[in-house]
């Protein structure tokens, strides 16, 4: 959408974590990013000044809570407070990557459920709605007492691979761990492809090279899919296992690219032809030469328009391959 959006009560603001995707989203919606200043004092305190009126407006604040997670989370909370105190009609937060979503349960004695704590903080600050992209655990939506729209990236990936001719029985979609079966099955259904799963006798880093494949990958082009690419170890070890299993080509796709230190070297050494991620996270880390970005801005921008116009977002979850009947 390139034309100016007609409703002047819709305003978008970008905080500092990922201004690149925010600018793209603004172009899709047809609304320029609002003016604000965000700075830190010498002791680390954050100060935000909204440099235009938001009174009576529906505000959408775009901020991924990625590295440095706590700085970006606090910046978001402070911005929400500023909007509420400036008499905004509604404050909606757009969080392409939702940090702390991996801490969604008590996995060992005396651990916190930090995803719930973050949800409480956002609600208490005055957030009216959350729009996010591929939560690590979909049950995090239930931690909020406000509406949460969790958009899926699988249709974007399906469209990308279909355009490359990567669909049908010659393709296999591989989940690199059993917790990702649902995600792999979703992409496989879109691509009319079978799935395979890599499982391990023990679920720890020391046994990653000892994984075994459930399903058939021999003679097929394999697409590894995960939600978060952090250290690169999961993809790298899974690619080696799939290569030993007889896959002819190996692709990897993830919703969020965090790229911890050393991830690029690990991925460069892996037998992966192409890595695909969305632009939900901005990073200054050196990236693998075989990495490509797929922007989620159009998906998020269309969701913002639909939410503002009180139209359903459910059509954004559908995907029909070109040539298929709707």
UniProtKB/Swiss-Prot annotation:
Pathway: Metabolic intermediate biosynthesis; 5-phospho-alpha-D-ribose 1-diphosphate biosynthesis; 5-phospho-alpha-D-ribose 1-diphosphate from D-ribose 5-phosphate (route I): step 1/1. D-ribose 5-phosphate binds at residues 226, 230-234. The keyword Phosphoprotein does not apply. The keyword Glycoprotein does not apply. Homohexamer. Involved in the biosynthesis of the central metabolite phospho-alpha-D-ribosyl-1-pyrophosphate (PRPP) via the transfer of pyrophosphoryl group from ATP to 1-hydroxyl of ribose-5-phosphate (Rib-5-P). This is Putative ribose-phosphate pyrophosphokinase 2. The lineage of its organism: Bacteria, Bacillati, Bacillota, Bacilli, Lactobacillales.
